[in-house]
């Protein structure tokens, strides 16, 4: 049951602000994106800026390769073949440009199943 673009737009026009807010949150969670506009940051002369975007890198799968592949699929949304290739070719970046909290969550999930992970 595929919807065409006109039907989707009509549904969005009829939705309340609360429903649209829920839709945005669901899209952000489903696709791992954010609806926030990029903020231009003026370069400060002296101090080093705090890092806000992180890369989660799988260093190695450890002993539980199958469990690591399952978690990689869950985190990235990749298919079985792609997730296996990523794990086999470690070290590889799993997620780039993620918030510190999300990076730490991903690291914890992978380390829980025996993988070696770095957050950069």
Curated annotation (Swiss-Prot):
The organism is Listeria welshimeri serovar 6b (strain ATCC 35897 / DSM 20650 / CCUG 15529 / CIP 8149 / NCTC 11857 / SLCC 5334 / V8)
Provide an example Pfam family for this protein.
Ribosomal_L12_N
Q: Which InterPro entries match?
A: Ribosomal_bL12, Ribosomal_bL12_C, Ribosomal_bL12_C/ClpS-like, Ribosomal_bL12_oligo, Ribosomal_bL12_oligo_N_sf
Q: Which UniProt keywords apply?
A: Ribonucleoprotein, Ribosomal protein
Quaternary structure (record): Homodimer. Part of the ribosomal stalk of the 50S ribosomal subunit. Forms a multimeric L10(L12)X complex, where L10 forms an elongated spine to which 2 to 4 L12 dimers bind in a sequential fashion. Binds GTP-bound translation factors.
- Cellular component terms, GO, for this chain's entry? cytosolic large ribosomal subunit
Q: Which family does it belong to?
A: Belongs to the bacterial ribosomal protein bL12 family.
Protein name per UniProt: Large ribosomal subunit protein bL12
Record's function text:
Forms part of the ribosomal stalk which helps the ribosome interact with GTP-bound translation factors. Is thus essential for accurate translation.
Identify the CDD domains for this entry.
Ribosomal_L7_L12
The UniProt entry, under Gene3D superfamilies, shows: 3.30.1390.10, Single helix bin (1.20.5.710)
Q: Name one GO biological process term.
A: translation
